């Protein structure tokens, strides 16, 4: 291996990309062919074979009483909020440190997203900030289980019960993670999951909704199916303006295999994450976000998040170090992964198009609209995200990651002098 940094003309540690596509199971092609042979591609309304089978399989593994697959994990949030009774002008509290789709789902139903700061230890929504933000217009709290973390569901449940609010868990990262032995997504009044192409379980696109209450579930079903009723249920037909958020039989058939493979892949990621954390601890400067909270009885590893310590890198900024590691063929992500919502270029929300935000935010929701110092610092200076694709390969993949980081650390003076 060249000891000279690739950033300055040396040979990179790795030239091949990590595989980040879906993992194909032994029965996936047979299931997809069965859909093609059937000529029946639609997913809902029931009874459609693979959608029903997948919904039963997924909700059964989650321990949820009701659930349905939808077209993606953003519209699922909008549907859930409507099903929970959120109306135009209502306020929904969520974290400022998440993919902007969490907040966009609130805006798209003409409700007002109230962005609050994150807990400095877990980087999930701060319960104290949630309670401080509650007003008479607040209807729902939307925590996000970020990366391999879980929001403090005990504290959030106590706050919600105290103030008569609902909880919608954004579980796009947390498939089958567990809090006190119960899957996340099932602790709140509703839960939303994503099967987008980067997720640990994917059909290219797709989402899933779970509910604790049958009426909420029936509202979800109607809202996802153009306002129609489920056969045999007429509680909402004719009174609900819905979306076409239906997932197809092809997506549902493929997702059955994703559930079947999950536990084996999860075990691989968990072992790799432990080895990576131990290896980075020896190198120094990367500390895992979070703590050993005993209430987290199973983590998920969509992303493992580390906190960068500039003191361990002679004052270099995180982005300088990550750029050098990237040149070695290893992509560890910083603020490009998740800028705070109010600083995301994709979160284009102004009062001309969305007048309900004007009273709280003025002309637009932008960089100066809210003060979220912990989220801002995490995104701009501290966060290092390791995608699950880097954790699902073989020992060589893991070795390449650690070798690249160590190589940059060994050439720290050269990097520092060039900064």
From Swiss-Prot:
Superkingdom per UniProt: Bacteria
Gene Ontology BP, a term: antibiotic biosynthetic process
Key words, A-Z: Aminotransferase, Antibiotic biosynthesis, Pyridoxal phosphate, Transferase
EC number: 2.6.1.101
Pathway terms, separated by semicolons: Metabolic intermediate biosynthesis; 2-deoxystreptamine biosynthesis; 2-deoxystreptamine from D-glucose 6-phosphate: step 4/4; Antibiotic biosynthesis; kanamycin biosynthesis
A GO term, aspect molecular function: transaminase activity
Modification N6-(pyridoxal phosphate)lysine, positions: 199
Cofactor(s) required for function per UniProt: pyridoxal 5'-phosphate
Pfam families xref list: DegT_DnrJ_EryC1
Matching Gene3D superfamilies: Aspartate Aminotransferase, domain 1, Type I PLP-dependent aspartate aminotransferase-like (Major domain)
Catalysed conversion reaction: 3-amino-2,3-dideoxy-scyllo-inosose + L-glutamine = 2-deoxystreptamine + 2-oxoglutaramate
Stated role: Catalyzes the transamination of 3-amino-2,3-dideoxy-scyllo-inosose (amino-DOI) into 2-deoxystreptamine (DOS).
Family: Belongs to the DegT/DnrJ/EryC1 family. L-glutamine:2-deoxy-scyllo-inosose/scyllo-inosose aminotransferase subfamily.
Protein name: Putative L-glutamine:3-amino-2,3-dideoxy-scyllo-inosose aminotransferase
Species whose genome carries this gene: Streptomyces kanamyceticus
